[in-house]
Swiss-Prot record:
One of its GO terms (biological process) is protein histidyl modification to diphthamide. Changing C128A: Resistance to diphtheria toxin. Present with 3486 molecules/cell in log phase SD medium. Changing C33A: Normal sensitivity to diphtheria toxin. Signal peptide: none annotated. Its main location: cytoplasm. Pathway: Protein modification; peptidyl-diphthamide biosynthesis. InterPro entries: DHP2, DPH1/DPH2, DPH1/DPH2_1, DPH1/DPH2_3. GO terms for cellular component: 2-(3-amino-3-carboxypropyl)histidine synthase complex; cytoplasm. This is 2-(3-amino-3-carboxypropyl)histidine synthase subunit 2. It comes from Saccharomyces cerevisiae (strain ATCC 204508 / S288c). GO terms for molecular function: 2-(3-amino-3-carboxypropyl)histidine synthase activity; 4 iron, 4 sulfur cluster binding; metal ion binding. The lineage of its organism: Eukaryota, Fungi, Dikarya, Ascomycota, Saccharomycotina. Binds 1 [4Fe-4S] cluster per subunit. The cluster facilitates the reduction of the catalytic iron-sulfur cluster in the DPH1 subunit.
Length: 534
């Protein structure tokens, strides 16, 4: 008999280890020689506490304020709360710290904020600035320490040719240093074809979005282009010149997340990364698009597709899901929808019936790029799934991750058709180019048009009308690929070894479970109210 699989997430020995020391190292962003006696002043300046206080004073209607920190800055949350509470005594404003984000740290966690009925979210650290659904947002990137002399030294070693076309880029916090780095390279070292990117604060047209940080642009620098929606390119080129990123080498401060890095590698000639936390320059290897092309062919012959939702805050998430479902059904494939926070190998391994995953997440860090083949099933994006399910597989060489662009591509692919064309409705198998053989299970929903099932005569029957096909089990007119896979397993979960001859006609007792969130379940609130009334 097979051993039951492990259904829990693996954890290391230090996952919940108690921290014994009270010393916290902040040299990576406050500098190696910061004075601990001036810690509160440095923290206040780094996190823009004074501008934040001014913002809250201008909006007295905000009484519940949530503070969202990434994992590497959560150690400063208590200090920030202490500084803010000193500015608003008598408990006029309640401050809540989001100690753990459900999805990507660069995105605003609206779901967690709504648990405490937040009226505004203050997001600290690096941010993707993607449009969200409802809540007002205040961004505070911070100004981390940077040794410019060390950066310039590594830059000169990587680019000895003064005429090379180079674009300077960084994440949101470190982008404040780019204008000064540009002046050194352009003015002192005489690099002639240098441009740099800056956060496009003017692109944030949302009424309830505020950026506390300020970005200095020298007077002799012109805007020469726009990179994506949230970055502006500056330089001393003629505005009439057409700035094409394909002509430039990228010099990036800090290491981008894998999805972001993959996108940048498809746009620029080459990518050079200098991370202040790591020694030396990194020039690869980077995630490759060649593996993505293979995954597209896997999706083309997949019978069961899992839609993996790794965000609940980004705008157009629901619209993208609806278009994906429509596309998958049109191609006569089965789909299942999963909402998973921080997906990992162990979580997704529990759903072995899924042939391929299509992930919806933030383009900066919410998309899984399986660079080392850790996951059991491939993971692709909506754009790649749309290319795979087209009538003919075409490879553009692009990597589109924006939801709005993906929706437009899917709508263009569907072309207003709700059903698959008659030429593809035959029972002929489809050739799987990855495994080099024909498969007849790539379109399980096609079987519905050939089945005529009759329900049981007894309306009180507890048995579902089931028929097994080559593609899956049909239960009351619905193809279930997971049910078919379950029937073929030797171990089917807890209770699978129950003696079927001992049938209890009364069935099991149904009990109502608990409701609410961990901060306060329903029965906790009821008990608290009873104690107050006594």
């Amino acid at each position: 008999m097979e051993v039951a699989p492990a259904l829990s997430t693996t954890q290391s020995d230090v996952a919940f280890q108690k921290v014994e020391t009270h010393e916290i190292d902040r040299s990576s962003y406050l500098g190696p020689c910061y004075n601990s006696d001036e810690l509160m002043q440095l923290i206040s300046a780094y996190y823009n506490v004074e501008p934040l206080v001014g913002y809250l004073e201008q909006h007295p209607e905000y009484q519940n304020v949530t503070l969202q920190f990434p994992d590497d800055l959560i150690k400063d949350s208590s200090l920030i709360v202490r500084l803010l509470q000193s500015k608003f005594p008598h408990g006029k404003i309640k401050f809540w710290v989001l100690a753990d984000t459900a999805y990507s740290a660069c995105c605003v966690d609206e779901v967690a904020a709504e648990h405490v009925h937040a009226e505004v979210v203050v997001h600290f650290g690096d941010a993707c600035l993607n449009a969200i659904q409802n809540l007002p947002v205040v961004y505070s990137f911070g100004t981390p320490f940077l040794d410019l002399a060390l950066v310039v030294e590594n830059f000169q070693r990587a680019f000895p040719d003064l005429s090379s076309k180079i674009c300077l880029m960084a994440n949101a916090p470190f982008s404040k240093h780019l204008s000064q780095l540009y002046n050194i390279l352009k003015g002192d070292l005489h690099y002639t074809n240098i441009i740099y990117s800056q956060v496009n604060t003017s692109a944030v047209e949302e009424k309830f979005v505020t950026i506390l940080d300020t970005f200095h642009v020298p007077e002799d620098v012109d805007q020469v282009g726009v990179f994506e929606k949230n970055s502006v390119l500056f330089g001393q080129h003629d505005k009439a010149d057409n700035i094409s990123p394909e002509d430039y080498h990228l010099f990036h401060l800090t290491t981008p997340q894998d999805p972001r890095l993959l996108y940048l590698s498809t746009v620029f000639q080459s990518v050079h990364i200098f991370d202040p936390a790591l020694p030396g320059m990194v020039t690869g290897p980077f995630p490759s698009l060649m593996r993505r092309y293979k995954y597209m062919h896997v999706a083309r012959t997949a019978g069961c597709i899992g839609i993996l939702v790794n965000t609940l805050s980004l705008r157009n998430t629901r619209e993208t899901i609806n278009e994906l479902v429509k596309l998958i059904k049109t191609r006569e494939k089965k789909h299942y929808l999963f909402v998973v926070g921080k997906p990992n190998v162990a979580k997704l391994a529990n759903f072995e019936d899924i042939d391929i995953w299509c992930i919806l997440g933030c383009s900066q860090s919410g998309i899984i790029v399986d660079q080392f083949n850790e996951f059991y099933k491939p993971i692709i994006t909506p754009y790649e799934l749309n290319l795979a399910l087209s009538e003919e597989v075409t490879w553009t060489g692009k990597w589109v991750v924006d939801f709005r662009d993906a929706i437009d591509e899917i709508e263009q692919n569907l072309g207003g058709q709700d059903t698959i064309s008659a030429s593809t409705t035959s029972d002929e198998p489809e050739f799987d180019v990855v495994r080099g053989r024909y498969t007849s299970t790539s379109r399980p929903l096609r079987a519905l048009t050939h089945l005529e099932l009759e329900a049981a005569d007894d309306d009180d029957s507890k048995q579902l009308t089931t028929r097994h096909t080559a593609s899956g089990a049909v239960i009351k007119g619905t193809v279930s690929t997971s049910a078919s896979a379950l029937q073929n397993r030797s171990w089917k979960g807890l209770g699978s070894d129950f003696d079927s001859t001992e049938v209890d006609n009364t069935g099991a007792d149904i009990e109502e479970g608990i409701s609410g969130v961990a901060r306060g379940y329903g029965f906790d609130r009821e008990d608290a109210m009873k104690k107050e009334n006594k």
